[in-house]
Amino acid sequence: MKELIEYIAKSLVDNPDRVQVTELQGEKTAIYELRVHPDDLGKVIGKQGRTARAIRTLVSAAATKQNKRAMVEIME
């Protein structure tokens, strides 16, 4: 899952070397913290949060397939 988030984020940003994903694992839930360069934050969030919502939907669908829950938090 972490690799999926990194791949999507690196495809969107101008500074792919500054993309960082941290995984916090629980029993049934995983929280992924996505950090990008401040200049790329708008690209990852998107207009009215649409890109961020799409990333969260993809990750949630992939996690559901593994009978888990996953949340993506975009950090500054």
Model-derived features with residue positions:
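RNA-contacting regions in translation and RNA-metabolism proteins
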Residues: 1-43, 52-76
